[in-house]
Structures are given as structure tokens and as C-alpha cells.
From Swiss-Prot:
GO biological process, alphabetically ordered: fatty acid beta-oxidation
Transmembrane segment boundaries: none
Species the sequence originates in: Enterobacter sp. (strain 638)
GO molecular function: 3-hydroxybutyryl-CoA epimerase activity; delta(3)-delta(2)-enoyl-CoA isomerase activity; enoyl-CoA hydratase activity; long-chain-3-hydroxyacyl-CoA dehydrogenase activity; NAD+ binding
Region (Disordered) residue spans: 708-729
Name of encoding gene: fadB
3-hydroxyacyl-CoA dehydrogenase, as annotated region: 311-729
Reactions performed catalytically: a (3S)-3-hydroxyacyl-CoA + NAD(+) = a 3-oxoacyl-CoA + NADH + H(+); a (3S)-3-hydroxyacyl-CoA = a (2E)-enoyl-CoA + H2O; a 4-saturated-(3S)-3-hydroxyacyl-CoA = a (3E)-enoyl-CoA + H2O; (3S)-3-hydroxybutanoyl-CoA = (3R)-3-hydroxybutanoyl-CoA
Stated name of the protein: Fatty acid oxidation complex subunit alpha
Function as written in the Swiss-Prot or TrEMBL entry: Involved in the aerobic and anaerobic degradation of long-chain fatty acids via beta-oxidation cycle. Catalyzes the formation of 3-oxoacyl-CoA from enoyl-CoA via L-3-hydroxyacyl-CoA. It can also use D-3-hydroxyacyl-CoA and cis-3-enoyl-CoA as substrate.
Annotated region (Enoyl-CoA hydratase/isomerase), positions in chain: 1-189
Cysteine pairs bridged by disulfides in the record: none
Amino acid sequence: MLYKGDTLYVDWLEDGIAELVFDAPGSVNKLDTATVASLGHALDVLEKQSDLKGLLLRSEKAAFIVGADITEFLSLFQVPEEQLSQWLHFANSVFNRLEDLPVPTISAVNGYALGGGCECVLATDYRLATPDLRIGLPETKLGIMPGFGGSVRMPRMLGADSALEIIAAGKDVGADQALKIGLIDGIVKAEKLRDGAISILRQAINGDLDWKAKRQRKLEPLKLSKIEATMSFTIAKGMVMQTAGKHYPAPITAVKTIEAAARLGREEALKLENQSFVPLAHTNEARALVGIFLNDQFVKGKAKQLTKNVEMPKQAAVLGAGIMGGGIAYQSAWKGVPVIMKDINDKSLTLGMTEAAKLLNKQLERGKIDGLKLSGVISTIHPTLEYSGFDRVDVVVEAVVENPKIKKAVLAETEDKVRPDTVLASNTSTIPIGELASVLKRPENFCGMHFFNPVHRMPLVEVIRGEKTSDETIAKVVAWASKMGKTPIVVNDCPGFFVNRVLFPYFAGFSQLLRDGADFRKVDKVMEKQFGWPMGPAYLLDVVGIDTAHHAQAVMAAGFPQRMQKDYRDAIDALFDANRFGQKNGLGFWRYKEDSKGKPKKEDDTAVESLLADVSQPTRDFSDEEIIARMMIPMVNEVVRCLEEGIIASPAEADMALVYGLGFPPFHGGAFRWLDTLGSAKYLDMAQQYQQLGPLYEVPDGLRNKARHNEPYYPPVEPARPVGALKTA
């Protein structure tokens, strides 16, 4: 053994070939600060070996290196710019030393090589991979850019266009694509990976492969003519601004950095990478996006913990077909849980099966499945008008019309047709679970399971615990939702649960703005372009359905009369009374026509002006800041109330529910992250300017208490001390 660290070791193989093996104590290898330091120590030893002829890098895990340790990021981002720059310089000196070894080097890459893992293998001369490879640089998705030389080496290896596509989009690619673009040099079966890598090293040692020429390309300026450079970088910048926009600075910064470094050698190019990385790491966007990643891990970890002793449902059922029922049935069958889809009429069953078939055909068109797989999946969805087979069902979700009487009747009838241990769930969006459970003999076996539309796209499932719901019931439904590829978040029962409870105060803020003379088009534009929502409130209401929102608004008002009962007729009432239900009938705040792809396209409709004039004061202009404040304060206040009342368990779960269920702008990180970024004291000052607008604008007591000391909701992060720990390595 030449060297043994906590996360890697170096040993001799044969004929002057050494292997450096990543083998961290946990289940995966991460390129954390300790591993970078250990790699430096390993290189100290290797550089002294006069008999060294070649070096093989490999992993003892199922994945090579999954990336940097993102749990370290928030503390690293607290480090002053100069110190962070020094640490990056140190880390890059380690990878440069690996790249500059006087012998050929190869990485034997299995599974994932992402982020820092990808940057590590870019520093070797050759890369041999297994068919299950996923390799790429996802940093821009976290609000940063590659910092270990990825933005320097990859363009010089692949050419500007292929590298920009991966780096700017934060993409990873599979083995075949990686081979095609030159990111790896070959693909072999896992059992032949080590021997194959040694064989390539021997060829390089013997002079059959020119490893020095291969290495030299990474040390020199990018080989592009001025015209080629202008074309590549102009197109890349245009594409990035179109897709990422102004709220995500990392992708455009990465492109501009690669462009500026194109004429430079490795050392100068790495300095530019460092100079670009450090300011990005100190942005609110990076903190928010890293926060989302960590919150996602927290939420998924919680679901895993909940379900560790639960048997996965083997057979499911959906009550109520149609678009929603068909979407749920498709998702369950697609992920391997057969499903019975029951309805009371053939038309709905046909609609449900058509929806499932349409979604499967899209997978076929994208090349994700073949015809055999399609027919196999569709055959596991059993449409029926009867309860036959319900005695074999482990879990049932009811997805009938949002009417408590109908839901109660369907649930009570179904309870008599299933086994005593079968779990029942309701896909209600607003009706309290306790109310629906009142007709059941086994309320402990019942909970809410709120999917979001369209089911196949929206990652969130709210799992709602009723007063009598058992832990086992929650665990079974969480297990099924997880199996379906969804992110389940458990919330406690109340009208609207969590997501709709906080959405309708947001809509109420919108209604008040319109009542006071705001133009709905401007409100939408500000909330989309300035705050960053994927849809403004008017457009969102049209998509949800004005009739659906009108009904839900009444349910919420009955549930929370003090805050959500209004004493005026609003825009939603006016459109509902005029039978303008949104996209579903082509008329809402906008008029909708199908485009060439059959998708609804919004157009201005002057007829809506007279309807809104009846419920609004004369039009007046509002500043962007006032629109954002009046829209967001009611939502944020309600989010905080949900935490204080125990409806949602943590800021992390609240923020993920908002991002995954409503499309809360990820670069803000969720309501609590936005609140922390703003500062609780500053938020209180802002909210107090609008408290005359009513109870929705009154800040909850818990938030007022935090504001006195400007306390955050997320625990404060201490700056890391990586430089002092590593610079002598």
C-alpha cells in the first residue's frame, strides 16, 4: 500500500502501474474538501515514485464519484471571497498535479461521474466507462459553475459547442452519447472495466497510444477560428438568455467565462474560472438553489424513513376515470404498480384510458419505450364499471368530482368492497379529510392523497393525515407515491391542506389589486418577469379553471372566515357568472385558441374589460414593488401560519411543496428561503405598510417575534474553514 486515506487509497498493481481507488466510508464517493486534501497527499506519494509508469483511477462503489459534497456548499459559500478563491486555487493545483504526472493516466468510470467527479476524470488522459455511465457538470442547476477546471478542460476536449451544451444546461449524458462527443474513450462491461483500463495504460506506456498529444490539447488555447468562436458563443449566449433568463446568472456567466478563456492556456483559463465561480457562490440564487437540493434530500430521506418497514403496494385502484384518474392510473402502471380504474360510465373510462394511452405514446415517440413495453404497461391498467378485483387491492385513491356528498358516498361504498387492511385515500384538493372520514367504519385506514395536474409532470403529492389516520396508512400511501416517482410530503388536515391553503390568499391579493384598479396584464407580467413565477395569477386561474377556483375559494372562505371571507364581488365571481371558465371553455381573463400543436394560446379579449369594470375601481398604475408585495405577503403569512399551527412540519417541507406543487420560483428557494434572504425585520416593515388591506396582511405573532431579532427560519450556517485546513496539504 503506497497511501491510505479516509476516502481513498493508492496501491501497486503490476509493471509500474499504480491504482488510486476512491472508497469513502459511506455508500457513495463524494469529492468533499477532505477527499480533495487526501488526493493531494496521494499525489505527494505518487510524485516520488521513480518506478511509476502509469496510474489508474477507479472506484470501489457502484458509482465512481457522485459529485461534490453539496452539504458543504452553504458553509463554503459563507467563506469570504478571497479565502474561497484561495481554496479553489488549492483544489485546482491538486487536479493540475494529477494531469501533469509524467506518466499516462486513465479513469475507469462506473455509474455516476458528476460535477467534481466529472472534473476529476477530465484531468486524466483517458476515460473508459461502463454502459451505466452518467457523466456531466450539473453545477449551473445549483446557481454556480464548474470550479475544478471543468469549464477549461471540457471545451478543449470536446470543442466549444458540445461543452457549452453540457455546462450551460447543467446536463449529464449517458455512455453512448459521451463516447460520440469524445468525453470518454471507450465502453466496456463492468466486469472488464479494470482490465480494459490497464490494457489501455499498457498501450500508452508502450508508445502505441500518444497520451502526451491527448494531454496537450487540454493545456492549450481552444482550437477555434475567430468566426467559429463568434458563432458558437453568440448562439450559446442567445440560447441561455432565452431559457435561463435574468434570474439565473450561472449559465450565462459560464458561457462568458469559457468565451473569455478560449484564447488562453490552462493556467490563465483556470484563473478566469476561479474569478467567475467565487462571485456566483455568494449570490442569493446559489444559496436558494443549493437549499432546494438539500431540502429535496431531506424530504426524500423523511419518506424513506417513514416507509422502511412497509411493504410496497402490489395492486392499486383509482375511483373516477377521466383526465385525472387516467393520469394517476398511467403513473402507477408506468412505475410498476398495476391499477384498476373504476368509474360509473363508459365515457369516463374511455377518457381515462385515452389519457393513459396518450402519455404512453409520448414515451414511445421519445424513444423511452418500445411497442412491447407500451402494450405491457397499458395491460396493467384494468378499466371497469364493477368492483371486481377490489378484494385484491392494497390501496385505493378516490378521484371523483370535488363534491363532499359524492366523495363520501363513493368512499363508503368502496370501503365495503375492499379488505379490512386496504388503505383508502382521497384526491380532494380542499375538502377536510376529517369530514370525508366521518362516513367510514375504518377512518384509521383513510387519508388524503392530493395529486397536482398534470399528474405525470407535477412532482408533488400532498399526503394528508386526518385526526384518526394511522401511521401505517400514511406510510403505505407515502410508499405508493414514492414508487410512482413522486415527492410525497405529509401535512396535517385543514381546509385546502397546505398548498391550496396558501395559494388562495395569493389569489385574494390578486383580487384586491384588481378591485383597486390594477391591470391584470401588468400584474401577470410583473409576477412572471420580475418575481419569476412560471405563470402570473390571471393566467394560472385560467389554467386551473375559474369555476374550480370559484368553488375552492368558497370552501376556503368557509374554513377560514376571519381572513378569507370577502365582503365584495371580485374578478373571479364576475368571470364565473359570465361562464368564462378559463382554458377549459376558451374564455377566461384571456381568450384561448389552439395553436398548430393543439395547445391553447392566450390572446387579448376586450370583452373581459366590461366584466372587470363592474368589480374594479378606475384603472390606476401600481409599481412593480407594490404588486409583488401585495401578491406575496398574504401567501407568505399563510405559509408561516401553517408552520406555526403544525400543518406543515418544517420550513424545508413547506418550501419544497411550494416549488414542486406551485412552481414557486426555484431561484428564490421557496417562501421561507425568500423570507430569510429578505430578512424577517425587513419583511415585517414591508407588510406593515399594507396591513390596512385586511387580516390577510397581518403578520403572524411568531414571525413578529423573529423580526424583533431579525432571526431566520433556516438555521444559520457557519462559514467553512477549508483553506486553513487544506492549504498545507
